[in-house]
A protein has these predicted regions:
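Long, distal/terminal scaffolding or interaction modules
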Residues: 175-245
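Surface-exposed amphipathic alpha-helices with a cationic face
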Residues: 88-96
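Charged phosphate-binding loop/patch that engages nucleotide di/tri-phosphates or the phosphate backbone
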Residues: 166-175
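Canonical Radical SAM [4Fe-4S] cluster-binding loop centered on the CxxxCxxC motif
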Residues: 4-52
Length: 245
């Protein structure tokens, strides 16, 4: 994936210590709408673009005992849609890391919901937005930077935002995925997964739908359906930490 840079320990963009990853693309919609050169990331845009493996970034994050979240920021993460979703998918599925992911976007909430962003097909973009939210435990900061406004404190992020149109929303897990508590069974299934090239050992067909986590179990997570996946490796359980919210 392509990035502009990494800050291993960032304390200015979220209330928890975070790894910050700067994405490399932007349409500079803030400057266009404000009719001037006001972008706070204009210098970053001039920096060289780096090519890195998403797995290396995730492993780097997981090795740091200080950081508790990952912040994906500017330029504009949603203008790198071919890297944004695969990164979060890899974090959740391959590395089984369910830490909070914070996304800073200059798009509005309505633009993202309606697929009015990027250069793609609106229907595809709407599906992309929903697929993103299905991963859960996300915080998304919305809104353009507008110059000459008073900064305000955002309760969700725990930091100051520059324009009064900007705000963050949390998209929590309704359920959470856990490994089966039977460690012997987990070991056995993981050995079979390895032998099977990552495909579900209880399925005959090998395609994207049967790659662990299989599509059927991902749909169960999406719809907050409790229970085990077919092979028994994962269990979707109620996230009791969200009770009463």
């Amino acid at each position: 994936m392509k990035i502009k840079g990494i800050t291993d320990e960032c304390f200015s963009d979220f209330k928890e210590p975070s790894m910050y990853i700067a994405f490399p693309k932007c349409s500079f919609k803030c400057d266009i709408e404000a009719n001037g050169a006001f972008c706070q990331n204009s210098q970053l845009a001039k920096e060289p673009t780096l090519e890195v493996e998403k797995e290396k970034l995730i492993e780097r994050y997981l090795k740091n005992p200080i950081t508790k979240a990952i912040v994906l920021g500017g330029l504009e993460p949603f203008d790198s849609e071919l890297d944004l979703l695969p990164f979060i998918d890899c974090l959740r599925r391959q590395y089984e890391c369910y830490d909070k992911v914070v996304i800073y976007t200059g798009y509005t909430e309505q633009e993202l919901q309606e697929g009015r962003w990027g250069n793609g097909n609106e229907e595809n973009q709407k599906n992309y937005w929903q697929d993103l939210l299905n991963y859960g435990n996300l915080v998304i900061k919305f809104g353009r930077f507008i110059p000459n406004q008073e900064p305000h404190f955002d309760e969700v992020l725990g930091v100051m935002l520059a324009s009064d149109n900007q705000y963050a929303k949390e998209y929590p897990f309704m359920t959470k995925v856990s490994l089966n508590p039977n460690s012997e069974l987990v070991k056995e299934i993981r050995e079979k997964l390895k032998e099977n090239g990552g495909y579900c050992p209880c399925k005959l067909v090998q395609n994207e739908d049967t790659k662990c986590m299989c599509k059927e179990f991902r749909e169960a997570i999406k719809n907050n359906i409790l229970g085990e996946c077919h092979c028994g490796l994962y269990i979707n359980v109620e996230d009791t930490s969200k009770r009463g919210e």
